[in-house]
Amino acid sequence: MEFHQIDERNQALLSKIAVDDGHGENSPYFDGWKAYDNDPFHPEDNPLGVIQMGLAENQLSFDMIVDWIRKHPEASICTPKGLERFKSIANFQDYHGLPEFRNGIASFMGKVRGGRVQFDPSRIVMGGGATGASETVIFCLADPGDAFLVPSPYYAAFDRDLKWRTRAQIIRVHCNSSNNFQVTKAALEIAYKKAQEANIKVKGVIITNPSNPLGTTYDRDTLKTLVTFVNQHDIHLICDEIYSATVFKAPTFISIAQIVEEMEHCKKELIHILYSLSKDMGLPGFRVGIIYSYNDVVVRRARQMSSFGLVSSQTQHLLAAMLSDEDFVDKFLAENSKRLAERHARFTKELDKMGITCLNSNAGVFVWMDLRRLLKDQTFKAEMELWRVIINEVKLNVSPGSSFHVTEPGWFRVCFANMDDNTVDVALNRIHSFVENIDKKEDNTVAMPSKTRRRENKLRLSFSFSGRRYDEGNVLNSPHTMSPHSPLVIAKN
């Protein structure tokens, strides 16, 4: 059964949300995942499979989490030592969450920010992961048709998380490589004016700090510019800070919470923070999303809405114990930062040897890789052609910049912290062979007549890297079926 097909009968029977493409998943960002699901790399069982470099997971310090759990079996209600709390934890819990969990989260958020700011546990609101928390905030702040200004490039799934069910809009604040994609006041004003001219009501600005996909942090002046901008226009500022503990080198991460305390005339009720343990602790499966708002009404309403996506009490109980262990938290944060720095340095150093540069970054679990020189021309069409070869032939799931709405073709987000060292070696070897092959083809075309050279340039990305061409038939029979509008499917037509 091909679940992506919606016939006329279902078009009439179902809601607009159920039948439209507002989910935003018809993009190379999600199709790369599906390509991996259909042909996952395994060093022994499937050594020629697709390596997952499109998933922003932090698995580098997972051993520390496992070791802590092994030493503290009482933290789980599903072990003999934790059973005495089973009934009290398994019973219905208040929407506020376990007090010890909210205290632990507030303490952890403060530690991640170097103790430079404190968080009030009474303002902690839970959500079903950062996705659920993000959507809840949008429901609290905007009506269908209202818009948020979002600097681009931005997290590819925002099109789903922020827009699909809320029916809000995203208006891009265009940033470019001339200043390393930094947000400027001029760019904000241009986007705001564009919305006004289209008679669209702007309800706020949304940023990710540290940035996904750039891996950079906002400096103090830019954050103050953003606060001043929202104050002047009396709109909200939502700061997604889920990568705040992934900073691995200078400059130090600055939270919007610090700016709120520093600025004398800041309208605090306009500031909201999104947080999660998915990236900072590498626990995406626990679905811990956090809303921290300085607006009392938002805190109250978000808490009521959280009934649609609560964090399980068992998860809260375990994490409350873990986060209250200050010695463990201190060691984890320091070691995690060290491991991220080492992996990032190793990965970018090897890319540099191949002539591939990345945006200078200091945070996150990915690099913003510059492959503009490999495009046959500077267009997004050429970017998609290159991406298809990387997916289908090089067998690496990397995410093209177009899926993050970047303004310049040729940038790719590549995740480096979701695999072991051996898999990193395989991935780097594949990239090296790929680039070397292209460079050789370029060298061989230099002496060709111009007409022949043009033909070779068009074909230079069509070589068979692995000796196995992508079998679209297998994709269409997979339980992870791609939409007929998928860039990977369209590529074959």
Swiss-Prot record:
Pathway: Alkene biosynthesis; ethylene biosynthesis via S-adenosyl-L-methionine; ethylene from S-adenosyl-L-methionine: step 1/2
Reported induction: By tissue wounding.
Family annotation (Pfam families): Aminotran_1_2
Reactions catalysed: S-adenosyl-L-methionine = 1-aminocyclopropane-1-carboxylate + S-methyl-5'-thioadenosine + H(+)
Keywords for this protein: Ethylene biosynthesis, Fruit ripening, Lyase, Pyridoxal phosphate, S-adenosyl-L-methionine
Cofactor(s) required, per the database record: pyridoxal 5'-phosphate
Residues where N6-(pyridoxal phosphate)lysine is found: 279
Protein task: Catalyzes the formation of 1-aminocyclopropane-1-carboxylate, a direct precursor of ethylene in higher plants.
Gene source species: Cucurbita maxima
Domain of life assignment: Eukaryota
Family, as annotated: Belongs to the class-I pyridoxal-phosphate-dependent aminotransferase family.
Classification via SUPFAM superfamilies: PLP-dependent transferases
Protein name: 1-aminocyclopropane-1-carboxylate synthase CMW33
Keyword Cell division annotated: no
Signal peptide segment: none
Biological-process GO terms, alphabetical: ethylene biosynthetic process; fruit ripening
EC assignment: 4.4.1.14
Single GO MF descriptor: pyridoxal phosphate binding
InterPro entries in the record: Aminotransferase_I/II_large, Ethylene_sulfur-biosynth, NHTrfase_class1_PyrdxlP-BS, PyrdxlP-dep_Trfase, PyrdxlP-dep_Trfase_major, PyrdxlP-dep_Trfase_small
